[in-house]
């Protein structure tokens, strides 16, 4: 529960709010009472120097017994109150008809809670600090009240050449700046709005400002350049917005922001939007905001993601990620837009290139020119391709409507990054899906992520071949329905001829070819996900055999039944069911077919499976994020319990998956053991290792990754290398440490 504060008596500029302090104390008490009764009231937390917005509470989620109480802005504001849905209708908010019309034309008929909570105090001239979850409509929260007041002030000023801006919006990234510009332009096309940022022509932006402007949106670096060059005058700025203020700190803009704020008129209205409140943001608000009202729609909630985002986590081997990625997109995106987040520029390029053979995709990262970057984003927005593979440069401020799927190809560097990556879907109240890929050694990291973010993953397996085929067919059918009728006329003759010859098989063949399955799909291992491999399950009934059931027992069994299978067996895992002795293992498809036709010893069952049972998990785990997660391990350490392999099974070396840190070349999570690190023959046991025939068999024990535990440093040839963190903690909001190192967790 938000703590209640003693509110000082405040002189309101609005005569209708003269007795506001008394009513605000009553609002605070009613909020406390509603929380006691179990109401999910969004927190509007007041600092000692701010006013608690009773109106924000009432408009969000108060009960019917409060409907007739007079709010701090007078009973006139509440006249005709009929409930949340009707009260959030923009047509009932007293906005200019022109603004209402443009919003409705864009399909915006109701406000979201953060927009409604901000509207009244913003129109009253209050300085604001607002917190809300990613994707909840913060841009229009400050945009609507500013546009309303600019429209009402307009006396022909918006057409005057050379006019200086009345609104300044600062954003940490060019993508966010462009998104804010787009929202304001589409909502108020008659206002002159200019977006300025680095990486593009300075002269073009100078010329745009010289023609006259009402709203300037930009990144701090380019804003300062234009101020120093005399192209941008801030003397008439009435409204300042700091959007995603906490990220100004993360990207190193704190000095630039303070320099800009010192250039602004003292009598302006300021609004600060920030997901977290690190110490720098608090200092900024104390120094540059006037008695700000804090509207907090996050409060102490553990859940940092917007509602409607379904979270999945999928365990994979490092070398199987690219194989499975296209199948995940096919099944879970359902033909919609997907953003795949990688850790490095190299990965983004390589993953995009690998996907292009089956799915149209483009890469987006820091080495791409601004011109190409804008072409790529526009193409993605327009649906010219459906998959964008991006580094975290795109996670902040990238606002693309109707993104259906987010895939974390690599673990994020910290929980904050996970939230903002995932927040690219499920925006504006829509549903979305986010899938986290991880290796077995990173399972503890995934659990830590659940704890830090306050979310819960549904653990899934890779889609089956049948699921991929079914989804592919649905996508192709949807595409065929979009073909223009005039185009089909040219192919009717050929279609009729084929139908006469082949019947329904003609259409089936066309669907298969368009889906990318001109040839039958090969089988795929459920363990390593390699094409051409099959996963079998061996089950032994109680009372049969002697000794402990182990991978060695499985290789002994295979040696007795089929020597070729024993020579080629891949990964072997023991099942977790305590009541049944069993194991799963991989074999090449042809050998598996032969093995399934052979007779097995009594009490044993051998089957081909389409879904993995629960397995024993004895692999070591890390508890670190992203690049600080060490999955390289010790080559001298043998795997414990659950997994062993023989022959060519197991993990392959991917020499391409390297990254550099501290001047040294290291392997990333995509590294694995080479066959040189493991001998297929292994060592012979001095005792019988198989209970299926008393024969001594040998197996190879693979080296198991032995990660280093620690977020800050990893061993680099005996030397310690640490990376400083300049951002803000996701848990407490203070700078200088990550959530995993937070002393307050």
From Swiss-Prot:
Residue pairs linked by disulfide bridges in the UniProt entry: none
This protein's UniProt keywords: ATP-binding, Chloroplast, Helicase, Hydrolase, Metal-binding, Nucleotide-binding, Plastid, Ribosome biogenesis, RNA-binding, Transit peptide, Zinc, Zinc-finger
UniProt feature, compositional bias: Basic and acidic residues: 656-670
Keyword Chloroplast: yes
Compositional bias (Gly residues): 641-650
Coiled coil: none
Record motif Q motif, residues: 88-116
GO function terms (MF aspect): ATP binding; ATP hydrolysis activity; RNA binding; RNA helicase activity; zinc ion binding
GO cellular component, one term: chloroplast
Region span, Disordered: 606-724
Pfam families named among the record's database cross-references: DEAD, GUCT, Helicase_C, zf-CCHC
Enzyme class, spelled out: hydrolase
Functional summary from the UniProt entry: Nuclear genome-encoded factor involved in ribosome biogenesis in chloroplasts. Binds specific group II introns in chloroplasts and facilitates their splicing. Required for normal development of chloroplasts.
Domain notes: The Q motif is unique to and characteristic of the DEAD box family of RNA helicases and controls ATP binding and hydrolysis.
Family from the record: Belongs to the DEAD box helicase family. DDX21/DDX50 subfamily.
Protein name: DEAD-box ATP-dependent RNA helicase 3A, chloroplastic
Gene source species: Zea mays (Maize)
